[in-house]
Amino acid sequence: MAWNGRFGEDGEEERSLELSLALPGYFSSSGLQGNTSTAADGAKGNDGFKASRPAAPVVGWPPVRSFRRNLASSSSSSKPPRGGRDAAAAATGGKVARFVKVNMDGVPIGRKVDLAAHGGYGELSAAVDRLFRGLLAAQRDPTMATAAAAAAAGESCTGEEEAIAGLLDGGSGEYTLVYEDDEGDQMLVGDVPWNMFIAAARRLRVLRSSDLNASTIRAGSRKRAAAE
Protein backbone atom coordinates (compact mmCIF):
# COMPACT_ATOMS: atom_id res chain seq x y z
CA MET A 1 0.00 0.00 0.00
CA ALA A 2 1.37 3.35 -0.96
CA TRP A 3 1.73 6.21 1.49
CA ASN A 4 0.06 9.30 0.20
CA GLY A 5 1.98 11.72 2.38
CA ARG A 6 -1.02 12.82 4.46
CA PHE A 7 0.04 10.96 7.58
CA GLY A 8 2.04 13.86 8.71
CA GLU A 9 -0.79 16.21 8.13
CA ASP A 10 -3.21 13.96 10.01
CA GLY A 11 -0.72 13.70 12.85
CA GLU A 12 -0.42 17.41 12.98
CA GLU A 13 -4.20 17.77 13.04
CA GLU A 14 -4.50 15.21 15.81
CA ARG A 15 -1.76 16.93 17.79
CA SER A 16 -3.41 20.27 17.31
CA LEU A 17 -6.69 18.73 18.37
CA GLU A 18 -5.15 17.31 21.49
CA LEU A 19 -3.63 20.66 22.27
CA SER A 20 -6.91 22.38 21.71
CA LEU A 21 -8.63 20.08 24.23
CA ALA A 22 -6.48 21.43 27.05
CA LEU A 23 -7.81 24.11 29.41
CA PRO A 24 -7.82 27.55 27.90
CA GLY A 25 -4.70 29.42 28.72
CA TYR A 26 -3.18 26.41 30.48
CA PHE A 27 0.12 26.79 28.71
CA SER A 28 -0.09 30.54 28.35
CA SER A 29 2.20 32.79 30.34
CA SER A 30 -0.73 34.81 31.69
CA GLY A 31 -2.29 31.64 33.12
CA LEU A 32 0.95 30.67 34.81
CA GLN A 33 1.32 34.11 36.26
CA GLY A 34 -2.26 34.03 37.52
CA ASN A 35 -1.78 30.68 39.19
CA THR A 36 1.49 31.83 40.73
CA SER A 37 -0.03 35.01 42.11
CA THR A 38 -3.02 33.08 43.50
CA ALA A 39 -0.73 30.63 45.26
CA ALA A 40 1.39 33.49 46.59
CA ASP A 41 -1.70 35.26 47.90
CA GLY A 42 -2.85 32.06 49.57
CA ALA A 43 0.54 31.63 51.17
CA LYS A 44 0.49 35.19 52.37
CA GLY A 45 -2.98 34.70 53.74
CA ASN A 46 -1.93 31.57 55.59
CA ASP A 47 1.16 33.28 56.97
CA GLY A 48 -0.89 36.27 58.07
CA PHE A 49 -3.44 34.05 59.77
CA LYS A 50 -0.72 32.15 61.59
CA ALA A 51 1.12 35.31 62.59
CA SER A 52 -1.95 36.99 64.09
CA ARG A 53 -1.98 37.09 67.90
CA PRO A 54 -4.77 35.35 69.82
CA ALA A 55 -7.55 37.60 71.02
CA ALA A 56 -7.09 38.89 74.57
CA PRO A 57 -9.62 37.63 77.15
CA VAL A 58 -12.53 39.95 77.76
CA VAL A 59 -12.08 41.85 81.02
CA GLY A 60 -15.02 41.68 83.41
CA TRP A 61 -16.51 38.50 82.04
CA PRO A 62 -19.07 37.23 82.91
CA PRO A 63 -20.91 40.53 82.79
CA VAL A 64 -22.23 41.99 86.04
CA ARG A 65 -25.90 42.73 86.12
CA SER A 66 -27.07 46.28 86.53
CA PHE A 67 -28.73 45.79 89.90
CA ARG A 68 -25.50 44.34 91.30
CA ARG A 69 -23.55 47.34 90.06
CA ASN A 70 -26.10 49.66 91.67
CA LEU A 71 -25.88 47.69 94.92
CA ALA A 72 -22.09 47.90 94.94
CA SER A 73 -22.12 51.64 94.25
CA SER A 74 -24.71 52.29 96.96
CA SER A 75 -22.80 50.26 99.54
CA SER A 76 -19.55 52.07 98.75
CA SER A 77 -21.25 55.46 99.02
CA SER A 78 -22.89 54.56 102.34
CA LYS A 79 -19.59 53.79 104.06
CA PRO A 80 -18.78 56.37 106.74
CA PRO A 81 -15.77 58.50 105.98
CA ARG A 82 -12.56 57.63 107.68
CA GLY A 83 -11.59 59.66 110.65
CA GLY A 84 -15.15 59.92 111.99
CA ARG A 85 -14.04 58.72 115.40
CA ASP A 86 -11.16 61.18 115.35
CA ALA A 87 -13.54 63.98 114.36
CA ALA A 88 -15.85 63.07 117.22
CA ALA A 89 -12.92 63.05 119.59
CA ALA A 90 -11.80 66.48 118.37
CA ALA A 91 -15.32 67.85 118.80
CA THR A 92 -15.43 66.64 122.41
CA GLY A 93 -12.03 68.00 123.33
CA GLY A 94 -10.00 64.94 122.34
CA LYS A 95 -12.01 62.45 124.45
CA VAL A 96 -14.25 59.71 123.11
CA ALA A 97 -17.21 58.75 125.30
CA ARG A 98 -16.77 55.47 127.17
CA PHE A 99 -20.16 54.62 128.65
CA VAL A 100 -20.59 51.52 130.80
CA LYS A 101 -23.54 50.17 132.76
CA VAL A 102 -23.65 50.54 136.53
CA ASN A 103 -25.89 48.45 138.77
CA MET A 104 -26.29 48.48 142.54
CA ASP A 105 -27.51 45.82 144.91
CA GLY A 106 -30.97 46.67 146.19
CA VAL A 107 -31.72 49.11 143.35
CA PRO A 108 -33.64 47.61 140.40
CA ILE A 109 -32.78 50.50 138.08
CA GLY A 110 -29.41 50.58 136.36
CA ARG A 111 -27.51 53.66 135.25
CA LYS A 112 -24.72 54.52 132.85
CA VAL A 113 -21.56 56.47 133.49
CA ASP A 114 -18.97 57.86 131.09
CA LEU A 115 -15.56 56.70 132.25
CA ALA A 116 -13.76 59.05 129.86
CA ALA A 117 -15.45 62.05 131.46
CA HIS A 118 -13.63 61.46 134.76
CA GLY A 119 -9.99 61.90 135.57
CA GLY A 120 -9.54 59.29 138.28
CA TYR A 121 -11.08 56.93 140.75
CA GLY A 122 -12.12 59.69 143.14
CA GLU A 123 -14.24 61.41 140.49
CA LEU A 124 -15.75 58.08 139.42
CA SER A 125 -16.70 57.21 143.00
CA ALA A 126 -18.37 60.61 143.43
CA ALA A 127 -20.27 60.17 140.15
CA VAL A 128 -21.56 56.72 141.15
CA ASP A 129 -22.51 58.14 144.53
CA ARG A 130 -24.59 60.86 142.87
CA LEU A 131 -26.28 58.35 140.58
CA PHE A 132 -27.45 55.98 143.30
CA ARG A 133 -27.59 58.03 146.48
CA GLY A 134 -31.19 59.17 146.08
CA LEU A 135 -32.33 55.88 144.55
CA LEU A 136 -30.93 53.93 147.47
CA ALA A 137 -32.60 56.30 149.92
CA ALA A 138 -35.91 55.91 148.07
CA GLN A 139 -35.57 52.13 148.32
CA ARG A 140 -35.17 52.41 152.08
CA ASP A 141 -37.84 55.07 152.55
CA PRO A 142 -40.51 55.64 149.85
CA THR A 143 -41.00 59.20 151.10
CA MET A 144 -37.57 60.02 149.69
CA ALA A 145 -38.75 59.87 146.07
CA THR A 146 -38.21 63.61 145.68
CA ALA A 147 -34.68 63.23 146.93
CA ALA A 148 -34.11 60.43 144.45
CA ALA A 149 -35.25 62.68 141.60
CA ALA A 150 -32.94 65.44 142.80
CA ALA A 151 -30.03 63.01 143.00
CA ALA A 152 -30.75 61.76 139.49
CA ALA A 153 -30.66 65.36 138.27
CA GLY A 154 -27.25 65.82 139.89
CA GLU A 155 -28.38 68.29 142.54
CA SER A 156 -26.78 68.41 145.95
CA CYS A 157 -28.40 66.33 148.69
CA THR A 158 -28.70 67.10 152.38
CA GLY A 159 -30.13 65.49 155.49
CA GLU A 160 -30.56 61.74 155.21
CA GLU A 161 -29.13 61.70 151.69
CA GLU A 162 -25.72 60.68 152.86
CA ALA A 163 -22.99 59.55 150.54
CA ILE A 164 -22.47 55.87 149.92
CA ALA A 165 -19.51 55.14 152.13
CA GLY A 166 -16.77 52.67 151.35
CA LEU A 167 -17.02 52.45 147.55
CA LEU A 168 -13.25 52.35 147.17
CA ASP A 169 -12.32 50.96 150.58
CA GLY A 170 -11.74 47.43 149.32
CA GLY A 171 -14.63 45.88 151.21
CA SER A 172 -14.23 47.70 154.51
CA GLY A 173 -17.32 49.89 153.98
CA GLU A 174 -20.97 49.02 153.51
CA TYR A 175 -20.70 48.96 149.70
CA THR A 176 -17.82 48.23 147.37
CA LEU A 177 -17.44 49.24 143.73
CA VAL A 178 -16.31 46.40 141.46
CA TYR A 179 -16.02 46.07 137.71
CA GLU A 180 -16.11 43.32 135.12
CA ASP A 181 -13.07 43.31 132.86
CA ASP A 182 -12.69 42.13 129.27
CA GLU A 183 -11.96 38.59 130.52
CA GLY A 184 -15.24 38.37 132.44
CA ASP A 185 -13.60 38.56 135.89
CA GLN A 186 -14.93 40.72 138.71
CA MET A 187 -12.23 43.04 140.01
CA LEU A 188 -12.05 45.68 142.71
CA VAL A 189 -12.10 49.21 141.34
CA GLY A 190 -8.85 50.98 142.12
CA ASP A 191 -6.47 48.04 141.84
CA VAL A 192 -4.94 48.95 138.48
CA PRO A 193 -3.85 52.26 136.95
CA TRP A 194 -6.68 54.46 135.72
CA ASN A 195 -5.88 54.19 132.02
CA MET A 196 -5.73 50.41 132.24
CA PHE A 197 -9.03 50.39 134.10
CA ILE A 198 -10.75 52.48 131.40
CA ALA A 199 -9.51 50.13 128.68
CA ALA A 200 -10.55 46.94 130.52
CA ALA A 201 -13.81 47.87 132.31
CA ARG A 202 -16.98 46.58 130.66
CA ARG A 203 -19.49 46.93 133.50
CA LEU A 204 -19.59 48.41 137.00
CA ARG A 205 -21.47 47.10 140.00
CA VAL A 206 -21.96 48.39 143.53
CA LEU A 207 -22.05 45.33 145.77
CA ARG A 208 -22.64 44.96 149.46
CA SER A 209 -19.30 44.34 151.07
CA SER A 210 -20.74 41.38 152.95
CA ASP A 211 -21.55 39.70 149.62
CA LEU A 212 -18.06 40.04 148.19
CA ASN A 213 -16.27 36.81 147.34
CA ALA A 214 -12.78 36.33 148.67
CA SER A 215 -11.76 35.14 145.20
CA THR A 216 -12.67 38.56 143.78
CA ILE A 217 -10.35 40.32 146.21
CA ARG A 218 -7.52 37.84 145.56
CA ALA A 219 -7.89 38.15 141.78
CA GLY A 220 -7.79 41.92 142.09
CA SER A 221 -4.63 41.72 144.16
CA ARG A 222 -2.94 39.48 141.58
CA LYS A 223 -3.77 41.80 138.69
CA ARG A 224 -2.63 44.81 140.68
CA ALA A 225 0.70 43.11 141.36
CA ALA A 226 1.04 42.24 137.67
CA ALA A 227 0.32 45.84 136.68
CA GLU A 228 2.94 47.15 139.09
Curated annotation (Swiss-Prot):
Disulfide bonds: none annotated. Induction: Not induced by auxin. One of its GO terms (cellular component) is nucleus. The keyword S-adenosyl-L-methionine does not apply. Homodimers and heterodimers. Aux/IAA proteins are short-lived transcriptional factors that function as repressors of early auxin response genes at low auxin concentrations. This is Auxin-responsive protein IAA16. The gene is IAA16.
